[in-house]
A protein has these predicted regions:
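Non-cytoplasmic
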Residues: 76, 147-196, 207
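Cytoplasmic-entry segments and transmembrane alpha-helices of multi-pass inner-membrane transporters
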Residues: 34-72, 94, 99, 104-108
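C-terminal transmembrane helix and the adjacent membrane-cytosol boundary/short C-terminal tail
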Residues: 34-41, 187-218
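Transmembrane alpha-helix signature in integral membrane proteins
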Residues: 7-38
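Membrane-embedded alpha-helices of multi-pass transport/permease systems
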Residues: 26-31, 88-92, 96-118, 148-149, ...
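Loop-to-helix entry region at the N-terminal start of transmembrane alpha-helices
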Residues: 8, 12-16, 59-62, 66-99, ...
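Transmembrane alpha-helices
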Residues: 18, 128-161
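Short cytoplasmic-facing helical segments at TM-TM junctions of multi-pass membrane proteins
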Residues: 105-144, 174, 214, 218
């Protein structure tokens, strides 16, 4: 192993983590909004059975261990990317595992919004879509950014486990060399690099959340 190998592994880990987080956000953000807006006391109430079904599906997906989930979604992975091994193949199970988690994080952030703010927007004749895009999301933006940072670091941890299916990145190196070949020094280097990546993501996310908090600019 040389510096170039580690550099490429870091890039693969970064690529898979960011891409998976982006797709998880695309699916999880609307779902999280739906969980709040579609509630019986929400701005766009949906049938109780439908909300109950959505919650059950989210809870089931969140409860399945990631390694088992990777195997379960092999058919879906093969249908989308044409293979079940490699860097691209790890994105599919990562997204499936992450988007329910993102939805719950979004739901938690939006539920922290003062109901009076939403009621004020409704009294001024704002539509549900306007309330979501102009009131709920902007007001909860710092919390949402913090939640996405949490999701990003969690997905980073999941991506390391994807080395089991030859997913590439630091996880593959740690498994192939550190575990199977008993090269503890390589395992330690991979762990340190993953910790540094988590710290970097967390620092950037915290700074962004602070900058977006309008209360701190008043």
């Amino acid at each position: 192993m040389n510096i170039a190998d580690y550099g490429f592994a870091i890039w693969e880990t970064f690529y898979v983590t960011v891409l998976s987080t982006a797709f998880a956000l695309v699916l999880g953000l609307p779902l999280g909004v739906l969980l709040v807006a579609g509630d019986k006391d929400g701005i766009l109430p949906l049938p109780g059975w439908l909300m109950h079904l959505i919650n059950i599906v989210i809870n089931i997906l969140r409860s399945v261990p990631f390694l088992i989930l990777m195997i379960c979604v092999f058919p879906l992975t093969r249908a989308i990317v044409g293979t079940t091994v490699g860097t691209k193949a790890t994105v599919v199970p990562l997204v499936v595992a992450a988007f329910p988690f993102v939805a719950r994080l979004v739901e938690t952030s939006l539920r922290e919004l003062d109901e009076g703010v939403v009621e004020a927007a409704q009294s001024m004749g704002a539509t549900p879509f306007q309330i979501i895009t102009k009131v709920m999301i902007p007001e909860c933006l710092p919390g949402l950014i913090s939640s996405m940072t949490t999701a990003l670091t969690t997905i980073l941890g999941y991506s390391a486990m994807s080395g089991v299916i030859g997913g590439g990145g630091l996880g593959k190196i740690a498994l192939s060399y550190g575990y199977y070949r008993y090269q503890t020094n390589i395992m330690i280097v991979c762990v340190v690099l993953l910790v540094l990546m988590v710290q970097a993501f967390q620092s950037v996310g915290t700074l962004w959340a602070t900058k977006s908090d309008t209360r701190l600019r008043k």
